Amino acid sequence: MEYNRQPCPIRIVEDCGCAFMMGTMGGSLFQYLKGFRNAPSGLRRGLHGGIESVRLRTPAIAGSFAIWGATFSTVDCVMVSYRQREDSWNAIVSGAATGGILAARNGIRAMANSAFVGCLVLAMLEGAGAAVATIYASDGGVKAEESLITVDQQMQRPQWETSVADSNLTGAELERVLDECRAYRAHNKMQQPMRSDAVEGKELGQLMKPMHSLVDLVKLAEIV
């Protein structure tokens, strides 16, 4: 289902206008080149001949395109309303019906030929669109897989990076233990005068407790 298109009542006007603009631009370019080529010799006459050809023949071409677009969109809306779905078959049947309707004044044989041509052209367009969509979908899947592989490779660090990170972590832990040791020693130095004043009169051996050495603190921190 095509979600980027307008609903059916508005779709007819939209397709008619788009076809009219296509006929106007394409017809103007083609008729200008044709008029410039068929004009008499001289640049001014060539320019005037091209403009005159555009003025005379482009409106008819644009009108034919607009009628084709409106007829195609109308048949497409009828098919959507009847089948209650939007797929490639609607466009193919609409192309055949449009070709037959527009060639109705030329007889049954002309209608059949025009319907066959319209059906063939729309089938080729729908097939090309489906092929392009499939190619883009496959490319998107491959790119998604490549991006996932790249992310996985980025998440897996090399062995030397892991060893460097572990050594950095060990060094940081050792530095933290040394800082705690320095802070503990400074705290003991600050508490020593206060203890001596509080326990004045007692024996010096009972007052002063042995201080922990750096090796003992490292063992208490479970580094070794």
UniProtKB/Swiss-Prot annotation:
Give the function comment from the record.
Essential component of the TIM23 complex, a complex that mediates the translocation of transit peptide-containing proteins across the mitochondrial inner membrane.
The opening ranks of the lineage are: Eukaryota, Metazoa, Ecdysozoa, Arthropoda, Hexapoda
Bilayer topology reads:
Multi-pass membrane protein
Q: How does it assemble?
A: Component of the TIM23 complex at least composed of Tim23, Tim17 (Tim17a1, Tim17a2 or Tim17b1) and a Tim50. The complex interacts with the Tim44 component of the PAM complex.
Q: Which organism is it from?
A: Drosophila melanogaster
Q: What is its main location?
A: mitochondrion
**Subcellular localization, per the record?**
Mitochondrion inner membrane
Q: Which family does it belong to?
A: Belongs to the Tim17/Tim22/Tim23 family.
Per the record, the gene is Tim17a2
Q: Which UniProt keywords apply?
A: Membrane, Mitochondrion, Mitochondrion inner membrane, Protein transport, Translocation, Transmembrane, Transmembrane helix, Transport
Q: Where are the transmembrane segments?
A: 16-36, 60-80, 115-135
Any single GO CC term annotated in Swiss-Prot or TrEMBL for this entry: TIM23 mitochondrial import inner membrane translocase complex
Q: Which GO terms describe its biological process?
A: protein import into mitochondrial matrix
Protein name as annotated: Probable mitochondrial import inner membrane translocase subunit Tim17 4
